[in-house]
Amino acid sequence: MRSAKLKFEKRRSRIRHKISKTSHSVRLSIFKSGRHIYAQIIDDSKSITIAAASTLDEKIKKLKKSHCNIENAIKVGEEIAKKADSAGIQDVVFDRGGYKYHGVVKALADAAREKIKF
């Protein structure tokens, strides 16, 4: 039987492979730790990070002690959308990074969808 970590890694690699086959070269990547949530807009053709936001940003960090929750995920989504808009990015591919599209991942995606299209 596969361990949970191995299942997660397989799911992550399957998602990344599907994304790499698309014509879009810019993706919105999500990472969750036990305490924080991170979002990056990455240009895979140039291998650079265009914009990044997380619960470690000073604006969001002041709000609550527990940082990886839906309220802060919405704030991170709004912040990454603002940074993408200022960088001139309108269209991205959403990379959920192996996480289920539920809870904080869904909240971040819905908040980011207000300004960027994916």
Swiss-Prot record:
- Membrane-spanning intervals of the chain: none
Q: Which InterPro entries did the record assign?
A: Ribosomal_uL18_bac-type, Ribosomal_uL18_bac/euk
**This chain belongs to which protein, by name?**
Large ribosomal subunit protein uL18
Q: Does the keyword Ribosomal protein apply?
A: yes
Species whose genome carries this gene: Rickettsia peacockii (strain Rustic)
PANTHER family per the UniProt record, alphabetical:
39S RIBOSOMAL PROTEIN L18, MITOCHONDRIAL, LARGE RIBOSOMAL SUBUNIT PROTEIN UL18M
Cellular component terms per the entry's GO annotation: cytosolic large ribosomal subunit
Which HAMAP family does this UniProt record tie to the protein? Ribosomal_uL18_B (MF_01337_B)
Its subunit composition reads:
Part of the 50S ribosomal subunit; part of the 5S rRNA/L5/L18/L25 subcomplex. Contacts the 5S and 23S rRNAs.
- Which gene name belongs to this protein? rplR
This chain's function reads: This is one of the proteins that bind and probably mediate the attachment of the 5S RNA into the large ribosomal subunit, where it forms part of the central protuberance.
Q: Which Gene3D superfamilies match?
A: 3.30.420.100
The UniProt keyword set, sorted, is:
Ribonucleoprotein, Ribosomal protein, RNA-binding, rRNA-binding
Asked whether the keyword Plastid is assigned, the reply is no
State the family it belongs to: Belongs to the universal ribosomal protein uL18 family.
Q: Which GO terms describe its biological process?
A: translation
SUPFAM superfamilies linked to this entry: Translational machinery components
Mention one GO molecular function. Answer: 5S rRNA binding
